[in-house]
């Protein structure tokens, strides 16, 4: 285990919807990579308990997706609160990356950050203010070299840990085919 300000923190959340004022975080996962995108460690993967009233706020897409993935059942069985998730995630990150050093990394990560800001501000403050958003590169590729998108596909399980693995693999793909650095 090597703490480094060059390590990158990848995070993914699953939520009951898209509005942090109405919806809740239902799953969180983190991965730390080095600057070359080699996975150093996987953090806690936590389904966060929510009431039936909160789960009822999910639209059909969320209900179907999170039920089919098994996440809804994990949420119902979970004893973890948001505070537990914050505490465990920060304890993991402190072993790998100094506070404020890593940008928040992921796909459409601005949405996750909005939820962290509202529901887990202590964790949100652990990240540098910058973003490493893989979806930005995807959008540029879609416009400038759309043929390259055919060479990569994600699992799309909508489980937090799987989604992070997809994001890291996608950025590796872009590095190899676009950046050639």
Swiss-Prot record:
Keyword Nuclease: yes
SUPFAM superfamilies membership: Ribonuclease H-like
Cited function: 3'-to-5' exoribonuclease specific for small oligoribonucleotides.
Species: Photobacterium profundum (strain SS9)
EC number assigned by the record: 3.1.15.-
Any one of the GO BP annotations: DNA metabolic process
Exonuclease domain: residues covered: 8-171
Signal peptide: none
NCBIfam families hit by this protein: PRK05359.1
Location of the active site: 129
Alphabetized GO MF terms: 3'-5'-RNA exonuclease activity; nucleic acid binding
Top-level taxonomic group: Bacteria
Family affiliation: Belongs to the oligoribonuclease family.
GO cellular component assignments: cytoplasm
Enzyme class: hydrolase
Compartment(s): Cytoplasm
Record-given protein name: Oligoribonuclease
Lineage: Bacteria, Pseudomonadati, Pseudomonadota, Gammaproteobacteria, Vibrionales
Keywords: Cytoplasm, Exonuclease, Hydrolase, Nuclease
InterPro entries to which the protein is assigned, alphabetical: Exonuclease_RNaseT/DNA_pol3, Oligoribonuclease, RNaseH-like_sf, RNaseH_sf
């Amino acid at each position: 285990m090597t703490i480094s300000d060059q390590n990158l923190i990848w995070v993914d959340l699953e939520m009951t919807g898209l509005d942090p004022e109405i919806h809740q975080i239902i799953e969180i996962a983190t991965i730390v990579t080095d600057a070359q995108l080699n996975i150093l460690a996987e953090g806690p993967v936590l389904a966060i308990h929510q009431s039936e009233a909160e789960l009822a706020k999910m639209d059909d897409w969320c209900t179907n997706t999170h039920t089919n993935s098994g996440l809804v059942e994990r949420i119902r069985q979970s004893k973890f609160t948001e505070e537990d998730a914050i505490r465990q995630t920060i304890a993991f990150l402190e072993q790998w990356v100094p506070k404020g050093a890593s940008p928040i990394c992921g796909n459409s990560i601005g949405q996750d950050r909005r939820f962290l800001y509202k529901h887990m501000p202590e964790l949100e403050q652990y990240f540098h203010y910058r973003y490493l958003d893989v979806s930005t590169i995807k959008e540029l590729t879609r416009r400038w070299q759309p043929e390259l998108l055919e060479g990569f596909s994600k699992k799309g399980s909508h489980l937090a840990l799987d989604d992070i693995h997809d994001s890291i693999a996608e950025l590796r793909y872009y590095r190899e085919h676009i950046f050639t650095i």
